[in-house]
């Protein structure tokens, strides 16, 4: 299955984007686990992903000097993509938390305080523990999500999504990368 993802970053990071990274086991992973995050278009929402990448950059990366939006073409086997909008996958995820709550919170308590931990969303940690426990071969995780793009707004979190994210774990799926917008 082909995906087109948009990632907002600084131009200095462009060359290293498709290189595998080591993630610290000392910090809480982001909401969809460890990997490279993209916005992807939702059904019938063409252009939303690139706009979300742009808004993400201006809201969350104000110090970047040479802001760019990188477009990447990803080729992923469907059975290696964990779709967390799928009801069955949500049920398995919730059951895993119920059955492993003590282990999850023990691991959480040993992590370093950071912004992700302060936000209180432990989904990424649960996903990492679940993938480890079940030895799941997953190359990407995707989900419709809510991202706060405007810090002047009161709404910080929501269960109603304003976009869709894909967290790429297997970087060999990147078939092409290009700068599609330079914003500095």
Describe each region flagged by the PLM:
Residues 1-32:
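ADP-ribose/NAD+-binding catalytic cleft of ART/PARP-like enzymes
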Residues 2, 8, 18-19, 66-184:
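Active-site and NAD+-binding cores of ADP-ribose-processing enzymes
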Residues 5-9, 46-49, 53, 72:
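Small-side-chain structural scaffolding
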Residues 11-12, 44-45, 77:
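Short, solvent-exposed loop/turn segments at secondary-structure junctions
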Residues 15, 47-49, 82:
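Short helix/loop capping segments that flank catalytic or ligand/cofactor-binding pockets
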Residues 25-57:
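Extended catalytic/binding region for NAD+/ADP-ribose chemistry, centered on the ART fold
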Residues 60-65:
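Arginine/glycine-rich "motif VI" loop of SF2 helicases in the C-terminal RecA-like domain
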């Amino acid at each position: 299955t082909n995906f087109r993802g948009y990632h907002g970053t600084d131009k200095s990071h462009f060359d290293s984007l498709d290189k595998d990274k080591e993630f610290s086991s000392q910090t809480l992973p982001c909401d969809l686990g460890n990997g490279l995050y993209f916005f992807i278009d939702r059904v019938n929402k063409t252009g939303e992903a690139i706009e979300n990448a742009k808004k993400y950059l201006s809201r969350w990366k104000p110090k970047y000097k040479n802001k760019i939006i990188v477009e990447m073409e990803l080729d992923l086997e469907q059975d290696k993509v964990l779709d967390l909008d799928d009801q069955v996958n949500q049920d398995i995820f919730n059951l895993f938390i119920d059955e492993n709550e003590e282990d999850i919170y023990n691991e959480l308590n040993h992590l370093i305080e950071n912004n992700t931990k302060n936000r209180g969303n432990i989904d990424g940690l649960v996903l990492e523990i679940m993938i480890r426990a079940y030895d799941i071969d997953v190359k990407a995780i995707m989900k419709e999500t809510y991202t706060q793009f405007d810090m002047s707004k009161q709404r910080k979190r929501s269960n109603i999504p304003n976009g869709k994210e894909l967290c790429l774990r297997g970087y060999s799926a990147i078939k092409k990368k290009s700068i599609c917008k330079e914003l500095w």
